[in-house]
Amino acid sequence: TAIMEFSGKELVRGEPDASSFPSGGLRATCEARGYTAWDPTSYAFVKDDVLCIPTAFVSYTGEALDKKTPLLRSMNALSNQAIRILKLFGKDVDYVSTTVGPEQEYFLIKTEDYEARQDLILTGRTLFGAPSAKGQELEEHYFGVIRPEVSAFMKELDEELWKLGVPAKTKHNEVAPCQHELAPIFDTTNVAIDHNLLTMEMMKKIAPKYG
């Protein structure tokens, strides 16, 4: 039986190779130390029997090598400026927290149609071709009944997101054909962004099951 140890010191800070960041391998490995730092304000979760711990990734001299670090710094800067303004109005606060609830719109396309389009495969969007026979002029898709296979996809997506602690709230059709939307419950900014990334990952993982 394999036994793995994970200490609190390793949780607070790790030291992986950062030679590929931020520009794709311009630095020698021996000169490219990077550090992972635990983000204790974002929830850890279990995915595929693996404990996933949200972290920030910075260089030896403190430069951001990821997209989470600038977000955390932006939240802190916004809090500092909001506190400064509030003090002008006589309010004594220690921290101002921001919340967001990013809606995730998406298209569900049959696998055979997707694989026939190089633009979809390479860029995730259509770059050429004739306009759709039916566009966004009418409202019957937005207010229409959700198709059974789409509803089944949405149900499984909700269940998998709840297992990861992502609080999905509403789901509905969107305006364009094959377009749909998932709306989460508002949460602290960095937590909401982590949840949004998990949502997109689970969508891509579950969708192929439904053709």
Residue ranges, per PLM feature:
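Glycine-rich, acidic/polar active-site loops that bind/position phosphate-bearing ligands
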Residues: 1-211
